[in-house]
């Protein structure tokens, strides 16, 4: 499978234009494009512009409603519950975290939960919204069921990611991971490439290890059995029960407290009905913020400077690889495979846009 490099600014403008065609206003279009490009810049191809075709289909089918306005259904000084009414997940998520941050500025802590939403992209984006306000940020989301429980072969939980961010120097601490071995998007990348995925990522309809990404995706879509494994793989000996438990905790912190559909019931009604939660904490409520920031910065540097394993020259802390990736891709362009490139052109064609007139395409070296 061939890869191409697309200029970040041109691809961003294209995504904003696409969102405008769907009926999103200027700020919404800018936010959605920023979240998509943030994923690609950070090296998270699975959550970047390759998602655009799925969003396009979601808008066409009515799963995503561009005209939906998230509604406050319950609120306290410290918390708020939003019904997204099948809005674009990014729109509801930005709204929710902005509300959580506003509450944290006033009271030291703010929480927002959302139900009846859609896929919201890369979770770290929202945690970093709080970090930029010199706060600790966290967010969680459930997804359509894609993960089998330990010893199971029926998908019951989503990829259910955890995102956490806190200010530090010279770069923030950012942790953003699925509670599955990999997110669905990673399987989609392998399926598009026609390559076998690593064993230990997923199981087939019989609960057996498989390297066939397309087969797993097809089985998930058709409810034929099999799915992605929780963090730790298939056995408690390698920690499978830990990933399974973390996925369940995220389910509680998203769908259960938001009053939404649990992962195994998401999308059964044909509407956007994922749930999310967002937390902002002014950590100054515990003491001297500058001292805490310095302490975290020192710890992170000590981790980087600690003894390396044989053959290794660098130890990374959470968020470092993303910073390195962003710098490289801003300079050299966003890498996009030929399958995703074809999908970007298809989206444009169906919306009356000439992709190649808007975005320069060059073969990756």
Predicted segments with their positions:
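Secondary-shell segments that build the walls of catalytic and ion/ligand-binding clefts
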Residues: 196-265
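Acidic, glycine/proline-rich low-complexity segments that act as flexible tails and inter-domain linkers
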Residues: 1-8, 13-32, 37-38, 46-66, ...
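Phosphate/diphosphate-binding glycine-rich loops and adjacent basic-rich segments that engage nucleotide
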Residues: 147-221
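A generic, well-ordered mixed alpha/beta core segment in the N-terminal half of proteins
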Residues: 79-171, 177-178
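Active-site cofactor/substrate anionic-group-binding motifs, chiefly glycine-
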Residues: 47-101
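Residues forming anionic-ligand binding surfaces in small-molecule and nucleic-acid pockets
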Residues: 73-79, 83, 94-110, 210-231
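Catalytic-core signal marking the mid-to-C-terminal active-site face
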Residues: 2-14, 21, 252, 257, ...
């Amino acid at each position: 499978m061939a890869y191409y490099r697309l200029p970040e600014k041109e691809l961003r403008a294209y995504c904003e234009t696409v969102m405008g065609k769907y009926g999103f206003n200027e700020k919404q279009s800018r936010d959605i494009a920023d979240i998509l490009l943030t994923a690609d810049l950070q090296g998270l191809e699975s959550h970047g512009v390759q998602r655009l075709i799925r969003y396009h289909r979601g808008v066409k089918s009515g799963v995503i409603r561009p005209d939906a306005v998230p509604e406050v259904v319950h609120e306290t000084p410290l918390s708020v519950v939003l019904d997204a009414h099948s809005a674009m997940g990014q729109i509801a998520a930005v709204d929710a975290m902005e509300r959580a941050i506003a509450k944290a500025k006033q009271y030291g802590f703010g929480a927002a939960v959302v139900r009846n939403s859609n896929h919201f992209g890369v979770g770290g984006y929202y945690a970093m919204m709080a970090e930029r306000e010199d706060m600790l940020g966290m967010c969680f989301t459930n997804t359509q069921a894609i993960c089998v429980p330990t010893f199971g072969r029926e998908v019951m939980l989503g990829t259910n990611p955890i995102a956490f961010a806190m200010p530090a120097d010279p770069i923030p601490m950012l942790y953003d991971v699925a509670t599955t071995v990999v997110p669905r998007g990673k399987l989609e990348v392998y399926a598009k490439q026609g390559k076998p995925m690593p064993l230990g990522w997923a199981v087939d309809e019989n609960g057996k290890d498989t390297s066939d990404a397309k087969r797993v995706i097809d089985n998930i879509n058709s409810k034929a059995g099999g799915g992605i494994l929780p963090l730790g793989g298939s056995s408690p000996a390698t920690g499978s029960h830990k990933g399974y438990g973390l996925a369940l905790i995220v389910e509680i912190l998203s769908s259960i407290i938001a009053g939404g559909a649990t992962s195994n019931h998401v999308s059964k009604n044909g509407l956007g009905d994922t749930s999310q939660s967002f937390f902002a904490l002014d950590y100054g409520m515990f003491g001297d913020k500058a001292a805490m920031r310095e302490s975290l910065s020192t710890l992170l540097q000590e981790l980087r400077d600690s003894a390396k394993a044989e053959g290794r020259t660098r130890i990374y802390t959470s968020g470092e690889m993303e910073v390195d990736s962003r710098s490289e891709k801003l300079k050299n362009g966003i890498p996009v495979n030929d399958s995703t490139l074809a999908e970007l052109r298809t989206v444009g064609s169906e919306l009356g846009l000439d992709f190649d007139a808007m975005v320069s395409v060059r073969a990756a070296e």
